[in-house]
Amino acid sequence: RRIQLTPGTTTVFVTHDQEEALAVADRIGVMNKGKIEQIAAPQNLYQRPATEYVATFIGLTNRLPGASNGDEAVVFGQRVPLLAGSAKVESGAVLVRPESLTLALAGSSDSHVGERARVEVIHFLGSLVRVDTVITSGEYQRWNKGEQLKATVQLPASELPAGLAVGDDVIVTPRPVAALAC
C-alpha cells in the first residue's frame, strides 16, 4: 500500500478477493459477465451499490422479504431507511447487510419485535460474531422460491446473547439503519 501511495504511481490490481480489493484500492471496478457494473471508492461500493449484483458481490448480503415505501423499506414488519439511489431488486425483496440486523434469544425481554429464527451456525471472528439463522416464522418459511429463508446476522462479540448456541430460537430484527436496495 505504501508503494501505491507514492506520488505519480499508478497501480492496477485484478483480484477476486473482495476484502483485499476493499483494503488496498482507492477505486474499484466491479465486472459482471464482461460488463462494468460500478466503479467507485470502496466505501461507496459497500454502502451504496448501484446494482443487486454489486451488493451481493461486495460483502455479505441478506435478501429478505420486504417492500419499499418511498424512502423507507419494511423488513420483518419494521420500517428502516432506504438509501437514496438504492439499487432496484425484484418486487418484494430488500437487501440488508448482516451488520444491519440484530438478534435476541426468543422469550427474552429484548425479543419483542422481529421474526423468529433458529440458529444454524455461530462463527466467532474475534471482535465480531456472525450468526447464520433460518427463519421459522410461518409467513416467511418458504419465501425464496420454496427454499428456507435464511438471515445472517453480524454483531460485535460483546452484543452476543449470553449462552447463545446452535439450535436456539432467536428473534431477528433489523437495526434502524439503511437498507441497501429494494
Indicate residue ranges for each PLM-predicted region:
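Gly/Ser/Thr-rich helix-start
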Residues: 30, 35, 56, 60, ...
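ABC ATPase nucleotide-binding domains
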Residues: 1-53
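Residue-level signal for well-ordered alpha-helical positions
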Residues: 27, 57, 107-108
